[in-house]
Every structure is written in C-alpha cells, then in structure tokens.
Amino acid sequence: MVKLWDGVLALPMIGTLDSQRTQVVMESLLQRIVDTGSEIAIIDITGVPTVDTLVAQHLLKTVTAIRLMGADCIISGVRPQIAQTIVHLGLDLQGVVTKANLADALKLALTRLGLTISKAV
C-alpha cells in the first residue's frame, strides 16, 4: 500500500488474484485505513490480467467495507477487457466509482478532498 497524499491510500494489485489473496488484501487495506485515518482508498487493478466472478465479488465487498468505515473507494485500472468481462458476468458495479487509470483516480480523490493541483507559471 502506498500513501499518495494525506488522506489518500493506493493499493496497486499485480498478478493473478484468487479469493484468498483478495481476502488478505482486503483485511490489510481496512486496517491501514484505520491506522492512517485515510478518507479515500484507490484500488488499482492495472496489473491484474483477468477478473473472474469471485474476485469481482471480493472487490465489491471490499468497497462496501471501506464505505462502512466512513471512507470512499475508487477502483482504477479498469481496462476494456476487464470491463467487458464484468459486464459479461452480469456484475452490478452501480455506485462503484471506477477510473481508467491511477492518475485519473488520484485527481478525483484530491477533488473530493477539496484540493486542486495547478501548474506553476
């Protein structure tokens, strides 16, 4: 896990995910949110080659658990192939904020914290 900004954690996930690994990651992320008092968690799945039904369900449960703790969650790195798989599996991501890449997710997170980034002139 990486602290990107005060109040913003990122969890880059790499490699094949199974239910056990996803569960361990969820528990670690929830504890880290408590430890740091972070308001927003970004789960980046750019490095995940495929998502099956069980993994997608664990991700949704993680988002729900994060919300129950009073924080927001953004899933980034949703590539076209993964998006098609999720739609094909009939999974309901309504209400889950997703972004195509980590940069867009961080931009949204900072906006939600009331921060803006601008280039120095």
What are these regions (language model features)?
Residues 19-39:
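A short, well-ordered alpha-helical element
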Residues 4-26:
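STAS-typified acidic loop motif
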